[in-house]
């Protein structure tokens, strides 16, 4: 392993001069700095993270705060995490993943040390108890999600309210008059999780505008729950012809359940979803869907954080517009 003394010997300077070139703590001549940088490149030297943090008061580490609470769909969370880690490496930063439900205490524990330079916070609630602390920290943060009162924070997310509306509007254009939303697990709504609540708001408002009969059904993600919710929907809304699904693991089991109950997709029932594009496109019946742009959201969250670390102004709110892709799961409603 290359040491700082090897770099110093190669550049013809003292180890302390190499340290000053890395940290900028003391001025050195441009010619000396270039010799040191050339030696670092030639030898492939990488400063020890702890030493670099002590020298520069920076750790080059970002915290990704994503509590793995009940009802969270872990594969989607991991898509966000991979995007954050990959983008952070482009900026020579590593990522510390915090998954425990520790609330303010966990955030404060990390923020009060030199472990991380900045934070990305996920699984945002409408009335998120972490907001006062995030506003008071001397370290920058970005939230992937929008609380009810986002003033003074930097937030980015898919426009989930419009996403819910877009799905309903698509069904309405196809002539469907009775629609239902099969949503996230009940505990997600009990917590007031922002993205799930906004889908409900958009779905309900769009249905009301179009004069559609509508209902909302939170549902567990276990495959066995699909049959129960399908039976309940058909019992409570026998004229149902359009369904919006915001529960990725339930998509295929739900289509299977409807077909077992005698409804063909899309001949008898049109289904749309808000989910990752590869999920929608890869099912037995490809699903008309609004894509969940987890890779773009993770990438742009890191980019916002890097700009904040550099002292550059960033917008407080960034909402990505939803994009609906029509596939084989929706069709015009057959005339009664």
PLM regions and their residue ranges:
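Bacterial carbohydrate/catabolite-sensing allosteric modules
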Residues: 86-90, 136-143, 147-336
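Short beta->alpha connector loops
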Residues: 100-104, 122-127, 248-250
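N-terminal helix-turn-helix DNA-binding module of bacterial transcription factors
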Residues: 1-60, 334-336
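Short acidic/histidine-rich motifs immediately flanking catalytic phosphotransfer sites
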Residues: 112-118, 236-241
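Short beta-strand segments enriched in small/hydrophobic residues
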Residues: 17-20, 57-70, 178-188
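Amphipathic helical "hinge" segments at domain boundaries
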Residues: 30, 38, 45-108, 118, ...
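Short acidic active-site motifs
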Residues: 50, 105-108, 129-130, 225-229
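Short acidic/polar active-site loop segments enriched in Thr and Asp
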Residues: 14, 60, 117, 177-178, ...
């Amino acid at each position: 392993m290359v040491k700082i003394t090897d770099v110093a010997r190669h550049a013809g300077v003292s180890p302390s001069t190499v340290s000053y070139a890395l940290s900028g703590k003391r001025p050195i001549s441009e010619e000396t700095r270039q010799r040191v940088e050339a030696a670092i490149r030639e030898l492939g030297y990488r400063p020890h993270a702890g030493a670099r943090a002590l020298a520069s008061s920076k750790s080059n580490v970002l915290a990704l705060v994503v509590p793995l609470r009940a009802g969270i769909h872990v594969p989607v969370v991991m898509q966000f995490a991979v995007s954050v880690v990959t983008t952070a490496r482009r900026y020579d930063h590593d990522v510390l993943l915090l998954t425990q439900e520790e609330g303010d205490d966990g955030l404060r524990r990390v923020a009060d040390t030199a472990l991380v330079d900045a934070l990305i916070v996920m699984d945002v609630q409408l009335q998120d108890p972490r907001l006062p602390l995030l506003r008071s920290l001397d370290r920058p943060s970005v939230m992937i999600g929008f609380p009810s009162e986002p003033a003074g924070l930097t937030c980015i997310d898919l426009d989930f309210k419009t996403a819910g509306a877009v799905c309903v509007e698509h069904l309405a254009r196809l002539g469907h008059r009775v629609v239902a939303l099969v949503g996230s697990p009940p505990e997600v709504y009990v917590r007031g999780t922002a993205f799930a609540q906004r889908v409900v708001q958009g779905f309900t408002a769009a249905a009301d505008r179009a004069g559609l009969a509508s209902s909302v059904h939170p549902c567990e993600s276990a495959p066995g729950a699909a049959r129960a919710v399908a039976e309940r929907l058909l019992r409570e809304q026998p004229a149902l012809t359009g369904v919006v699904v915001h529960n990725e693991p339930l998509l295929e089991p739900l289509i299977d359940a409807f077909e077992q109950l005698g409804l063909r997709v899309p001949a008898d029932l049109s289904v749309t979803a808000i989910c990752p594009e590869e999920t929608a496109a890869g099912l037995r019946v490809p699903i008309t869907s609004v894509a969940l742009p987890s890779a773009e959201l993770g990438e742009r969250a890191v980019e916002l954080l890097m700009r904040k670390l550099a002292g550059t102004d960033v917008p407080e709110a960034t909402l990505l517009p939803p994009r609906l892709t029509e596939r084989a799961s929706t069709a015009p409603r057959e005339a009664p």
